């Protein structure tokens, strides 16, 4: 546990380093800390903080910079978030961006607004497409070809083209749609499949054929899993802390391309309440100590369905990025729930 003097100096050092990007020396700490301390006393405290692994001294400078461990202590115990006025400005921007519309477009807009407001990379883990349906409609395209339209409880509209063994008239398709919606709406397609086995003797053959085809078309699609949307990854090329080492930056862009570890991180974050902050290697996202990830889950009708966040340098203004992520998650939840 740090004493108040050491806490003040560490907080001042991190705030100045975030603002200026240069190692912080004792003269700067004396000027901004508000403490009446001699340069020698400040240097002694800095030496103690270095022994604790909270700051390091680059070889080319007499000043010091925070370590990931130092950032962690700062974020957990010393951080003051932006003022109410700043949060209101963020809220207005996010509300304007997240206009009602198709859920996929709203989620993509959330990734974009995260990137634009933070000036880093915005990421959103999209909801896993529901195998539960709210409504189904069949539309005849041509002989033995039918368009299956599925509406999920989240408001997502999915289209499938079905090839059938025989032709169906428009009236038969309407009858099948009405029957399915009346008897099976709100169930998963696996439940529908199970119910069909139980009720097959009570149904006409053509009705059974259509429903089996609909269930198969709905559950055989490979795009029902979660996906990651990324916006503004090129912003990271403008971050001096990262662009100075292109080899490490290429590793990060490989992660963006493959998305597997990013999906795993966001999936883990969705099981925690509120904003989560992963500093340096805590994320296990990339072998880059200079990266941090700020995430928050979002909901539809009170149920967590995904995660969003910002990826940027450890030298990010956490007091500004945390409200951006938190507000975007809350407003995305509200917008999707109102669909």
Swiss-Prot record:
One of its GO terms (molecular function) is DNA binding. GO terms for biological process: negative regulation of DNA-templated transcription. Gene3D superfamilies: 3.30.450.40, Heat-inducible transcription repressor hrca homolog, domain 3, Winged helix-like DNA-binding domain superfamily/Winged helix DNA-binding domain. Transmembrane segments: none annotated. It holds the Pfam family HrcA_DNA-bdg. Keywords: Repressor, Stress response, Transcription, Transcription regulation. It comes from the Bacteria. InterPro entries: GAF-like_dom_sf (IPR029016), HrcA (IPR002571), HrcA_C (IPR021153), WH-like_DNA-bd_sf (IPR036388), WH_DNA-bd_sf (IPR036390), WHTH_HrcA_DNA-bd (IPR005104), WHTH_transcript_rep_HrcA_IDD (IPR023120). The keyword Plastid does not apply. Belongs to the HrcA family. NCBIfam families: hrcA. Negative regulator of class I heat shock genes (grpE-dnaK-dnaJ and groELS operons). Prevents heat-shock induction of these operons. This is Heat-inducible transcription repressor HrcA. The lineage of its organism: Bacteria, Pseudomonadati, Pseudomonadota, Betaproteobacteria, Burkholderiales. The gene is hrcA.
